[in-house]
Amino acid sequence: MKKISLLFLICGLFLVSSCIPTQTIKGDGNITTENIPVSEYDCLELEGGGMVVNYTQSEAPEGLEIKTDRNIFEKYEFNVENHKLKIRPKKEFRKHTNFRPTEFMVTANSRNLKKLAAAGSTHVNINSPLQAEEF
């Protein structure tokens, strides 16, 4: 009897947890391109959906260009903390939000890249040979 009760409890918890509402934000089709000034970074941390990243290692100053729907752009943050370039949804959109952009193109470059971390449906293109002490 205890096993059956435990089974019903587990099934009930599973059903309740699967009912957590998620929000889907679709791109509005108003594609915009923004150049964002960034300081020196050697790590890329990417989070979100539908993102295509084109990275180039070069001696040029660090750069970041974002091309996406205006309504998607407004819900993301782009900043460098402790030499890590972080591209991710703003805090209020990190949980239970699906992004479906019309287009989400990130073009980034830096002098050095030690680490790359991506979460979500992100495609990364490395457009140059990488020279790194560790990777």
Regions found by a protein language model. Give the residues of each.
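Intrinsically disordered, low-complexity terminal regions
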Residues: K2-F135
